[in-house]
Amino acid sequence: MANKKIRIRLKAYEHRTLDTAAEKIVETATRTGATVAGPVPLPTERSLYTIIRATHKYKDSREQFEMRTHKRLIDIINPTQKTVDALMKLDLPSGVNVEIKL
């Protein structure tokens, strides 16, 4: 291939599904003969939401909700056409966002 590296960035709310998706990608890339660097765990993004429990008053009574976004980075070095075709046909679990840069 003309490009020397494919960078795959994965995002998910559950780290177990994210790790299984990363494992599938690494296994597919190594099976087709490419060199893989990763998965590298990136910092977890944490969103915190504070909501008043009561509808009209009692501002001191609040509830907090948290949403965590886990991220992984995988680099595929020297991919072949066979590697790209296998990655296009790969079935990943739902709930995993995949960003690919060539």
Curated annotation (Swiss-Prot):
Sorted UniProt keywords = Ribonucleoprotein, Ribosomal protein
Q: Which SMART domains match?
A: Ribosomal_S10
List this protein's GO terms for biological process: translation
One GO CC annotation, please?
Answer: ribonucleoprotein complex
Q: Which Gene3D superfamilies match?
A: Ribosomal protein S10 domain
Write down the Pfam families for this protein, in alphabetical order.
Ribosomal_S10
Q: Decide whether keyword Ribonucleoprotein is in the record.
A: yes
Q: Name one GO molecular function term.
A: tRNA binding
Q: Record's family?
A: Belongs to the universal ribosomal protein uS10 family.
The record's section on NCBIfam families has:
PRK00596.1 (NF001861), rpsJ_bact (TIGR01049)
State what this protein does. Answer: Involved in the binding of tRNA to the ribosomes.
Quaternary structure, from the entry? Part of the 30S ribosomal subunit.
What protein name applies here? Answer: Small ribosomal subunit protein uS10
